[in-house]
Amino acid sequence: MMMRGMNMQSMMKQMQKLQKNMKKDQDELNATVFEGHAADDAVVVKFTGDHKMTDISIKEEAIDPDDVDMLQDLVLMAVNDAMSKIDKQTQETMGKYSRNIPGL
């Protein structure tokens, strides 16, 4: 009976450590800035790891009043580029935790 309590206490300590490490990794990921680019940097966007846009840069030559659709497409491409980088890094950083938890 005592042995079982020791195992449970040890398991709880491991879970607390895991939770602390997950939070640290998530905080670092959220603070990381990811850039998305389109058309030779005609449009560059910056996002934090928690998907908040912090900056957008549009080169003058990308602005054509007669072709608004092109600029919209460039912005979408840059945003999607940044989002895929965030998703990839999130999977690399946080995926290690779900691999160690049965059922996830």
Curated annotation (Swiss-Prot):
Compartment(s) where it occurs, according to its Swiss-Prot or TrEMBL record: Cytoplasm, Nucleoid
Superkingdom assignment: Bacteria
Presence of the UniProt keyword Endoplasmic reticulum in the record: no
GO molecular function: DNA binding
Pfam (any one): YbaB_DNA_bd
InterPro entries listed in its UniProt record: YbaB-like_sf, YbaB/EbfC
Key words, A-Z: Cytoplasm, DNA-binding
Span list, region Disordered: 1-24
Biased composition range(s): Low complexity: 1-19
One of the record's GO cellular component terms: cytosol
Subunit structure: Homodimer.
Functional note: Binds to DNA and alters its conformation. May be involved in regulation of gene expression, nucleoid organization and DNA protection.
Xref: NCBIfam families: DNA_YbaB_EbfC (TIGR00103)
The family this protein is said to belong to: Belongs to the YbaB/EbfC family.
Protein name, as recorded: Nucleoid-associated protein LSL_1227
UniProt organism field: Ligilactobacillus salivarius (strain UCC118) (Lactobacillus salivarius)
Record lineage: Bacteria, Bacillati, Bacillota, Bacilli, Lactobacillales
